[in-house]
Every structure is written in structure tokens, then in C-alpha cells.
């Protein structure tokens, strides 16, 4: 019996595949709470699928290395809100879904500029980031060293602290906020885009590179990551190119 799944999986006729490199102008900031209680509260407030809640809480705690914090770190956590990056044995990373959200956010903003109806929904259904983990990379010194294992940042390059203010039932409160960041860095990821042009309201047809770069031109000013209201996360698109695929019979 022929395995049809093997025959049609990764059908090269359905999607076009691109690679993209974004170089951050200054820094990218982490936005995931590092204290255990904060991790639980953050996930419970943001996860819609409650059936997966406990597993996600456990996985996030592990990837944030909360069990390996020093006594000094724990003392800092007790008196501050500390946001950082997820990490594994390869280095620190942002998630592919964050980049997907960036594209959707920009689509929602520029939909009227491009005269595309339901642009956010169209991007959500057509543009996919292939990687689950997008590692934060050091500056490239030589071409073609992207896969060098030493090219990934293992930890943030710094952190800064500031005051945050909020209104509660007990009145206005202030707390110390600590944010991890990486400067002098870039990311590279793979985009899979449905192979069709978008049709505007006035019947113009936008090819994939055109509408993707419109999204990027807005996103690079809006930023990626946390603390964007403070001017962090702005970037420049250093490379955007199609990966040629060979069709198999």
C-alpha cells in the first residue's frame, strides 16, 4: 500500500520557502517572567487552552532555569519583576510564534495602506515561521558561519532596572522592574508562505516578496520583543531570499 502521507508531505507546490535575517539596531529585550509565581500567573493569563496549562507552566519554568538561580538572584526576584529569555543547551532564544505575531500585528496596522481587507487574518493563514526556537545570534564575522554552535548567545549581555507603577484596589503601588537584554545581535529564521498573490480591494495583485517586505518595513520600526515602548527591539532586515526547492516525484 502506497504511503500517501510520505508522498504529499512538505509539498513544494503549496508553499514558497524563504530565509530572513534581522539585525537589531540596539537591543532585544526578554519578556518572560523569571520568578516561579510570576511564570504561573503569566501563563494562566495568556493561555487559552486550559487543558495544557500545567504542562506549559512546567515547561516554561524548566526553560527559564529557575531552579539554577543563585541566592542573590532569588533575593532580587523577591523585590523585583524580572523578565528574561527562554534558553536551552544551545543558547537563548525567542519563539517562532513571537515573529508570527509581529507579522500579524503589522498586517493589522497597514491593512488600509495596502488596501487589503482582512489582512491580519490572511497573514495568519498564509505566513508561517518554520522554527519553534529562533536563537539570538552573535554578529557574523565571516559568511556562511550561521550554523556555528559558538555563534549563539548563551546568556543575556546585560540587564537594566527601572520603576513600574500600577493602580490597585489598595491604591497606587510602585515596584522595581528588571529586564534582561541582548545587544549587538541578529536572528535568522525560515518563512513558509502559501504560494499565491494577495488581491487588494481595487483588484491589484501583490506578490509574496512585495507584501512580506511591506510588513517588515512597518515591523522594523515597531520592533520585536519586550519593552518596545522604550524604543527597544527595532531592527533592519539584512537579508530576505527564497530557498529554491526541488520537486520530487
Residue ranges and their predicted role:
Residues 1-249:
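RNA-interacting cores
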